[in-house]
Amino acid sequence: MKSKIIVLSVIVLSIVSVNTQIKQETFYHPEFRETQRSASFGISTAYAYPPGVGILTNSPNCLSCHANNGPWKDDPNTIIDILDKDTKKSLKQADGTFLIETKKGEQKTVLTVIGNRKNNSIPASYRNAWLYIDPNTIGKSSLSKFAPNWDVNLPMSCRLVGDNLKGYEDANITSLPMTIQPLENAKDAEISLQVMLTQGEAVKNNAKEGMTGSYFERKVKLIVK
């Protein structure tokens, strides 16, 4: 009996210790300060904040929380591109929008490429963030904020700069694949690609301090062949 009590005491102390470490506040956004009762002995644990645009809040874009005060401008030195993963061909159109076409049920993988040219006086960003979102889904109950009836595996990311991609040797970039698939009821749609190039770290509970960033938006047209 004595040994069982000792074992139980060790387990309880271990859980308390782990939850004490987890419970440290790691929020940049005060509106996401929520606690949840853990299934283990009812001890509260804290959530770290997730992306706020249209997911946990009805914020229309990144600037609801972050400052648009970075040195990167919407000029030829800034790279925001979407490539066909197989051909590496840019899907950018003459009007500056992007066009992604695929058949119903067929998967299409693209590369999101973000960064800036090396041969200029503007420093490289440290971290790039991006989000593909259908603005019409913000404020609605749908869990997915991508175009309705389109499957997607990676609609958002926050990535350190330093990826290598043929054709972009003269730039500091991030590059990640995203696969989409129009389902049976999918229709043509227009979504928004929201991008931030950033340096520094945001201050806890105040995402407008400590981090500099430049915000950009691009229109992306999804076409069912």
Name what the model sees in each region.
Residues 21, 31-36:
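Short, low-complexity, charge-dense intrinsically disordered segments
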Residues 1-4:
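Positively charged n-region of N-terminal signal peptides that target proteins for export
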Residues 9, 34, 38-42:
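Intrinsically disordered, low-complexity segments enriched in polar/charged small residues
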Residues 9-15:
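Bacterial N-terminal signal peptides
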Residues 6-9, 54:
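Short helix-onset patch at the extreme N-terminus, typifying the N->h transition
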Residues 19, 29, 41-225:
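Sequence context surrounding c-type heme c attachment/ligation sites in exported
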